[in-house]
Amino acid sequence: MYEYRSSRRALFTIISVGIALLTVSILHSGYSQSPSTFSVSSMVLGKDKPVSMAIDEKTSKIYGIFATSSGEKNLLYVIDVAQNKVIDTIKIGSQKNDFLTNIAIDPDRSIIYAAGQHLVNENGSDIAYDTLYVINSTNYKFKRIQLYGETEEGKEGSLAGISFNPVTNTIYLGSLYPEGGKPGLYVIDGKSLQPILIDKWQYGIKDIQLDPESHLLYAGAKYDNLISVIDESNNLIIDNITAQSPIAITLDKEKNILYEAGSDGKVNAIDLKSKKNISSIQGESVKNILYNPNDKLLYIVDQNLTNILSKNSNVTKSMAIAVNTTNNIINKFETDFIVDNIIINPSTNQVYLSGYDGNNSKLFIIKPQ
């Protein structure tokens, strides 16, 4: 999704938070021992599982990709957060042939961009095409832009992160292949919808963070163990930052800090001037991170895998915490839902989380700090 998307060596201090989902390893001595609890409301969305979501801040609508219990992933929910209700559900293409995975919004042109996969039978073989779906958010008419295809059986990767730059009208799509395929970063002009592939990585890109003001793009290469800094004006890599299996990245432009979450559950703060890690937060299974420039808090979504696998349905399975710029944990929120997604409406400073408990999905609404 697009968001307008220490000092000297010291002994690490480790603290437990809540159910010990998170421990904090920091280079600062001051931190909150007892973070307060977020003020949270929620609404039931339905029986389908949320996959990805993005918000149109102009209309106060959240668009979410949802998966059914039978594995269909072509369902789009439209949630009006002003009315606190789902106002529409739309099927994009065919439930047997179209599988959407990630979503971004162009609010100025009323367009939804979704990364996904389209299955086509060619000469008796099922070919899986990595596909960009361009969806009109008014009438939900759509077109598919096929990027790369191979036989479905044995296909080892797919499109991953998606981000949109409204200043240049450009879509960015990460292509992640741990084996074979066509890994890299697609750069797609929003007017012509013609793709260019940057293929400078062995395995490709998992997540993307844009900074339109500096014309820089940060691309997290999960299996290459690095974050590439790309000049958007010429699509050239100007720097590479070593990072351990980055799965999510977010940017504090004011302090010039890039936060990255790795597959090991650790969230690192990287000083973009020195390219050095200046602090770390150790989680168990961090799924998403997002920095909010309005309240200057870093939001972290973490999961407790032991409790998720447990038969006990009344235990904490996910936690969201907010960390300030000096690594104080300010607030936390625990739930027995499995939470993956977090978005922020920059106009209202409202934070939204989506989760699923095996029976129902919920939208959690965190009141502004």
PLM region spans:
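Basic side chains
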Residues: 8-9, 61
